[in-house]
Amino acid sequence: MANKHLSLSLFLVLLGLSASLASGQVLFQGFNWESWKHNGGWYNFLMGKVDDIAAAGITHVWLPPASQSVAEQGYMPGRLYDLDASKYGNKAQLKSLIGALHGKGVKAIADIVINHRTAEHKDGRGIYCIFEGGTPDARLDWGPHMICRDDRPYADGTGNPDTGADFGAAPDIDHLNLRVQKELVEWLNWLKADIGFDGWRFDFAKGYSADVAKIYIDRSEPSFAVAEIWTSLAYGGDGKPNLNQDQHRQELVNWVDKVGGKGPATTFDFTTKGILNVAVEGELWRLRGTDGKAPGMIGWWPAKAVTFVDNHDTGSTQHMWPFPSDRVMQGYAYILTHPGTPCIFYDHFFDWGLKEEIDRLVSVRTRHGIHNESKLQIIEADADLYLAEIDGKVIVKLGPRYDVGNLIPGGFKVAAHGNDYAVWEKI
């Protein structure tokens, strides 16, 4: 009986440890918009960065789309099983990179682009809508009846209506078609079993319904999944975000809820991204919502929110929605001390000379067990000062104001600091 009690106790300890590790995730985007141009291949190049990535405390690396694509970056895929035609490298190099990550205890996340697909051949109408899967057999060899019926001119009118937003540059795939579902699930499971991927980042996830995403997640069982649902915030007449962004973050929460809140699904917290972009420009009061909590998705459902400063679209050479470049470390001081799962961008870590500063912040997060559901207490949120305490162990300050000594309780010491930010940790 004693042995049984001991075994049960050990099981509960390990279960708790497993849950703690799962919630302490730090994601890293391992590429930018120009990575495909790298001499010798990006997969080979990134192999040389694995030690630094693992040493930083990063738990997951998001890799670029791996399949053959008519766009060099991988976001216009065609032959999904063909991983040898990628501009980032070939299948063997990809597997070696994933093996190296696994050897350091880091998981690999695939960029899954399935909303749309480019065709290999024209049909009798002269329209490119005959797809080739990239295998000798008929897997993923589809025709126009696998295209959403309302996606003209590609469709032949036999498919189901689109369940999400239209993507104009390529045919929108009919995800209500049972063969489409079956063969995409098989492909996802092949990426796991044969290539070694552990989870998914769903590109343009607003292009198909959450019910569809649930099918792919439930039937492929990734350990981690994050969706890109990028929609516009609500803006006022001054061109700045409204104080209340509840409708915007509700869309993100609704997606996760429909996919299955108890599963691995998360979404990028575009609400926090948009607010933080403006807040660091002398409007730090924006970081306290009308309910006194964080104003983004992390204020409502932090366990399912992936926070970020920039990515290959918002930053890099595309600059669609860039974070103020001279305040990037304020952004990292925020996301790396707050609840939610933070995502670090390759450019900032390796190309901007910010590696040591980001390393220190991740170390503070790891050392004090800050995780995606940590308790956030906002102490001050004024134009020039944001001050918050996390789990009673870490305090973060953003903004140029320096007279905050009276707001920092005893028993804390400075753990990291830089341009208009500082972090204290409990001694």
From Swiss-Prot:
The active site is at D203, E228. Transmembrane segments: none annotated. Pfam families: Alpha-amyl_C2, Alpha-amylase. It comes from the Eukaryota. Ca(2+) 2 binds at E132, T135, D137, D141. Ca(2+) 3 binds at D151, D166, F167, A170, D172. Its EC number is 3.2.1.1. Binds 3 Ca(2+) ions per subunit. Residues 1-24 form the signal peptide. Induction: Type B isozyme mRNA is undetectable in unstimulated cells and increases a hundred-fold after stimulation with gibberellic acid. Substrate binds at residues 75-76, 201-206, 230, 232, 250, 257, 293, 299-301, 312, 318, 397, 414-420, 424. The record marks D313 as: Transition state stabilizer. GO terms for molecular function: alpha-amylase activity; calcium ion binding. InterPro entries: A-amylase_bs_C, A-amylase_pln, Alpha_amylase, Glyco_hydro_13_cat_dom, Glyco_hydro_b, Glycoside_hydrolase_SF. Its cofactor is Ca(2+). Ca(2+) 1 binds at N115, D162, A165, D172, G207. One of its GO terms (biological process) is starch catabolic process. It catalyses: Endohydrolysis of (1->4)-alpha-D-glucosidic linkages in polysaccharides containing three or more (1->4)-alpha-linked D-glucose units. Keywords: Calcium, Carbohydrate metabolism, Germination, Glycosidase, Hydrolase, Metal-binding, Signal. Belongs to the glycosyl hydrolase 13 family. There are at least 4 types of alpha-amylase in barley. Monomer. This is Alpha-amylase type B isozyme.
